């Protein structure tokens, strides 16, 4: 359909520490553009930026997005993000949201420090917290999709995430506010 929006996910921080927090770089971002024109959508959060690349940015501060799923009925976007050795994350994407990955620690670290938190709420108190984390060990999450249809029974509407470690499928049930139900 003309004017249909789409989400394009850029690679993680491409192993350069300052890129995830630099909104004029496309690394470590969720980008939103019009499929017909290739231009950024006019309601993107940084559309008035003087920098052309920043106009495409929908959210930033991501480490390594491996999967994206759009929730049927709501249009909410979730990402599956692979952590370094811990704390894989599932994030509910918010317009203009900073997801807190900063391996350069606001320039205090030379290079790329993978030991920093996936979502650093101390360095970025306004960062958007993950709706799910793997904890102390990575599960190497990658693909993401929503189960849709009555054939899924009680799982209809669940978010499923594939995990490379242990070759498993994680099934996450979501609350109305988008958080993961325990």
What are these regions (language model features)?
Residues 3-181:
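Beta-propeller domain segments
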């Amino acid at each position: 359909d003309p004017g249909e929006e789409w989400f394009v996910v850029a690679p993680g921080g491409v192993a350069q520490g300052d890129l995830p927090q630099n909104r004029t770089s496309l690394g470590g971002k969720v980008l939103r553009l019009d499929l017909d024109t290739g231009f950024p959508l006019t309601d993107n959060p940084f559309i008035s930026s003087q920098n052309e690349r920043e106009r495409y940015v929908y959210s930033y501060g991501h480490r390594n997005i491996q999967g994206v799923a759009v929730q049927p009925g709501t249009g909410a976007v979730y990402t599956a993000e692979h952590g370094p050795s811990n704390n894989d994350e599932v994030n509910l994407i918010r317009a203009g949201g900073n997801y807190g990955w900063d391996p350069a620690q606001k320039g205090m670290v030379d290079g790329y420090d993978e030991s920093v938190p996936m979502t650093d709420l101390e360095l970025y108190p306004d960062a958007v917290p993950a709706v799910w984390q793997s904890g102390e060990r990575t599960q190497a999450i990658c693909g993401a999709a929503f189960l849709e249809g009555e054939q899924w029974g009680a799982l209809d509407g669940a978010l499923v995430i594939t995990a490379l470690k242990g070759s498993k499928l994680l099934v996450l049930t979501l609350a109305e506010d988008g958080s993961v139900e325990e």
